[in-house]
């Protein structure tokens, strides 16, 4: 497996964001030292050399939400809507906006193929 590029960008501040403290009513004094929820998650997939981790994470979150483990949603569908190019990175908020406004198609409708930027494209 090729070493994946990390393309997640920190979302810009948005006045609609709420600090977590706003939702915590009771004080939690004891937390477990570890939590492993991996048994309920889709398997890790290979994004190749493209910085498309946000697209893969978003597709996997939707698969988890719908308990869809026998097939995949298309990270390519999401990446094509939120990335300028293979190396531009992406904001998680933009990926969530794609799910909200457009949904996401199954992998078989738009298969993922990594798009790798090379300097030869700039010449």
Describe each region flagged by the PLM.
Residues 47-70:
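Alpha-helical support elements that line or immediately flank enzyme active sites
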Residues 32-34, 38-42, 75, 101:
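Generic secondary-structure boundary/loop-capping signal
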Residues 1-36:
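N-terminal zymogen propeptides
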Residues 72-85:
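Acidic helix-start/capping segments at beta-turn-to-alpha-helix junctions
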Residues 34, 71, 75, 92-96:
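Alpha-helix initiation and N-capping motif
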Residues 39-50, 82-86:
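A short glycine/serine-rich beta->alpha loop
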Residues 1-6, 31, 59-63, 82-123:
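Predominantly the structural core of cysteine protease catalytic domains
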């Amino acid at each position: 497996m090729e070493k994946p590029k990390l393309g997640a960008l920190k979302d810009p501040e948005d006045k609609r964001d709420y600090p977590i403290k706003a939702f915590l009513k009771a004080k939690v004094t004891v937390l477990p030292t570890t939590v492993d929820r991996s048994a309920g998650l889709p398997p890790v997939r290979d994004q190749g050399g493209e910085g498309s981790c946000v697209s893969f994470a978003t597709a996997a979150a939707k698969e988890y939400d719908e308990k869809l483990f026998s097939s995949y949603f298309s990270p390519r569908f999401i990446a094509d809507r939120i990335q300028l190019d293979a190396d531009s990175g992406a904001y998680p908020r933009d990926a969530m906006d794609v799910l909200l406004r457009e949904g996401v198609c199954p992998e078989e409708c738009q298969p993922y193929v990594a798009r790798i930027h090379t300097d030869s494209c700039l010449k």
